Amino acid sequence: MSLEDAFDEPAFVPYLAAGDPDFESSLAYVEALARGGADVIELGLPFSEPIAEGPTIQQAVVRSLEGGMTPERFFEFVETLDVDVPLVCMTYYNLIYQYGPAGSQPVVPFVERAAEVGLKGFVVPDLPAEEAGPLREACDEYGLDLVFIVAPTTAGDRLERMMEQVSGYVYVQARLGVTGAREDVSDRTAETLARLEAYDVPKAVGFGISSGEQAEAVVAAGADGVIVGSALVDIVAEGHENGDAPDVVADRLESLARELKSGAVAGKQRQPGPERT
């Protein structure tokens, strides 16, 4: 299934850092999200300087790195997963650029390896559209998508450059600032979605969604899906701190996943329909 096909109905797109808090537990957690109704799963390949992340995901990155996660280990993780949903790698450009044997062409070895293990695309928060040419070309060569993050403040000319290169879906930032679960949904979300109506690519809203009610409201505002990270990572962190068994944590993740997916689907029923004459 392609990334765009995953948005045939309102999509639930969860994020977890691969390897948090350890390889085996993380496998179970990702598979629990798939059982809970995930349509696409974003897997974080940890980088030592995660500039786009809030404290919750920063700590997940630390746990993953301390557990031995590396790019090659990440690819092994993807190969080991038993899920039937598209997987997207969320990481930082330095890891993509530096991967591969000495003297190899930058970017291409990482994208080639990603295609080999079955990944469907990338989200690269620190890569401006103006500098994305090499990665876009490699993705085209190996059949992968490149997702960009659009903020409420993204200027029109920069938005145009993003939308010329984006594929799969657009990651719409619901709030300004770094990621993290919030108590409400920004009023600017609908405004940002309205700016994107002219572009024929699914729009998935993230940065702060933590409940089924929020997921419903975001889809009702016109989104094609919701992206949820911090609320799920919080469950992993709490389970790790309390010493809970992985299957217990997995059950909690699956339960929240079902709530979020149900909320997204319910939101579709609230979207304005075509005007009747």
Swiss-Prot record:
Q: How the protein assembles, per its UniProt entry?
A: Tetramer of two alpha and two beta chains.
Q: What is its EC number?
A: 4.2.1.20
Give the matching PROSITE patterns. TRP_SYNTHASE_ALPHA
Which family does the record assign? Belongs to the TrpA family.
Q: Which InterPro entries match?
A: Aldolase_TIM, RibuloseP-bd_barrel, Trp_synthase_alpha_AS, Trp_synthase_suA
Q: Does the keyword Lyase apply?
A: yes
Q: Could you tell me what this protein is called?
A: Tryptophan synthase alpha chain
Keyword RNA-binding appears in the UniProt entry: no
Q: Which organism is it from?
A: Natronomonas pharaonis (strain ATCC 35678 / DSM 2160 / CIP 103997 / JCM 8858 / NBRC 14720 / NCIMB 2260 / Gabara)
The protein's matches in Pfam families, at most eight in alphabetical order, are given as:
Trp_syntA
Q: Which Gene3D superfamilies match?
A: Aldolase class I (3.20.20.70)
What reaction is this protein's catalytic activity?
Answer: (1S,2R)-1-C-(indol-3-yl)glycerol 3-phosphate + L-serine = D-glyceraldehyde 3-phosphate + L-tryptophan + H2O
Function of the molecule? The alpha subunit is responsible for the aldol cleavage of indoleglycerol phosphate to indole and glyceraldehyde 3-phosphate.
Name the NCBIfam families on file. Answer: trpA (TIGR00262)
Q: Which positions are catalytic residues?
A: E42 (proton acceptor), E53 (proton acceptor)
What is the main EC category here?
lyase
- Which keywords are on file for this protein? Amino-acid biosynthesis, Aromatic amino acid biosynthesis, Lyase, Tryptophan biosynthesis
